[in-house]
């Protein structure tokens, strides 16, 4: 069987179409023949289904500039798991943007109109642009060519934690605001702050206090500007991003609390009825600028930690002014 490499495709004839496309979903039909992407041809060489391409065996072809060993590791892994898949090329799949492979449900192929996963591939020493995530599976290939799959999804964050709070007064002390005589609803129903003791006083974080003052539910000397200024003194621009995300979470009916012990900005509760009958938090939220680039190792660590404590990792991507927030959930996936 004669196969030749022409540019970025491997040309194969009608016999190859019958053997590889019709029965196993390799390649793209072209005038009765098929074109193979180099990674597909490399897999056929690896399996021994073809002997050579332009005189190159599997070892020679994989070592050439025609095919990426990182792409091959993912392609082979997904084929080993029983999936048919197509390289995401213009004219080969309906929507090629934002993916490297389009993976079909088991038992389906490129002739069906079903897609299981859109896969984007990176090596462990590459970086992933935060805004590129969502609506795809990130396949990370480590130095031993093992593949970790991370499902990324853009979603809305919402809940029913919207208890009303009567206005109260507080005192700005260092990096906290203390409400000495707060209404019971502040902590018990709306889950703001932490109680200092049995006397009923509640201490608020700066981000909680800034939100409450801006919403007119808390008064402090100097007003909201004093709290925000203090927040910027201790956190810089990060405080404004965290405040924007905190505000958006509260507006969506979600009660955020510090996520420090989990290495996150917030942990969130979607359905708070009272502080005494509190369920488990559902999300860990990290606040990041929209132009953030993830190191795969850090991303895998965040997701692994969230999974270990039965939560979902969500990244809140903020613009400079915090006017727009995109929520990207990332979870481990076993295809």
UniProtKB/Swiss-Prot annotation:
GO MF terms, alphabetically ordered: lyase activity; nucleic acid binding; tRNA-intron endonuclease activity
Residues forming the catalytic site: 269, 280, 311
Disulfide linkage: none
Reaction(s) this enzyme catalyzes, per UniProt: pretRNA = a 3'-half-tRNA molecule with a 5'-OH end + a 5'-half-tRNA molecule with a 2',3'-cyclic phosphate end + an intron with a 2',3'-cyclic phosphate and a 5'-hydroxyl terminus
Family the entry assigns: Belongs to the tRNA-intron endonuclease family. Archaeal long subfamily.
Assembly description: Homodimer.
Protein name: tRNA-splicing endonuclease
Gene field: endA
């Amino acid at each position: 069987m004669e196969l030749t490499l022409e540019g970025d495709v491997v040309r194969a004839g009608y016999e190859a179409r019958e053997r590889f496309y019709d029965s196993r979903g390799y390649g793209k039909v072209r005038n009765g023949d098929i074109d193979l992407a180099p990674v597909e041809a490399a897999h056929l060489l690896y399996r021994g289904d073809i002997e050579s391409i332009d005189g190159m065996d599997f070892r020679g072809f994989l070592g050439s500039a025609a095919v990426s060993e990182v792409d091959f590791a993912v392609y082979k892994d997904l084929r080993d798991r029983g999936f048919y898949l197509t390289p995401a090329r213009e004219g080969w799949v309906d929507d090629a943007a934002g993916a490297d492979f389009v993976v079909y449900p088991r038992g389906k192929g490129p002739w069906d109109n079903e897609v299981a996963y859109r896969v984007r591939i990176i090596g462990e020493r590459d970086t992933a642009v935060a805004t590129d995530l969502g609506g795809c599976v990130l396949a990370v290939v480590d130095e031993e060519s093992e593949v970790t799959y991370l499902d990324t999804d853009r979603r809305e964050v919402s809940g029913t934690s919207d208890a009303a709070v009567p206005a109260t007064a507080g005192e700005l002390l260092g990096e906290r605001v203390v409400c000495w005589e707060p209404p019971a609803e502040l902590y018990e129903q709306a889950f703001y702050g932490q109680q200092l003791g049995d006397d009923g006083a509640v201490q608020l974080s700066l981000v909680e206090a800034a939100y409450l003052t801006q919403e007119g539910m808390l008064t402090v000397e100097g007003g909201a500007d004093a709290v925000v200024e203090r927040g910027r003194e201790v956190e810089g621009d990060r405080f404004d991003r965290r405040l924007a995300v905190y505000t958006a979470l509260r507006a969506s009916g979600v009660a955020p609390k510090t996520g420090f012990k989990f290495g996150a900005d917030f942990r969130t509760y979607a359905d708070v009825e009272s502080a005494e009958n509190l369920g488990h938090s559902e999300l860990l939220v990290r606040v990041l600028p929209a132009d953030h680039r993830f190191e795969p190792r850090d991303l895998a660590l965040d997701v692994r930690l969230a999974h270990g404590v039965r939560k979902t990792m969500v990244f809140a991507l903020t613009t400079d002014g915090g006017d727009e927030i995109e929520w990207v959930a990332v979870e481990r996936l076993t295809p």
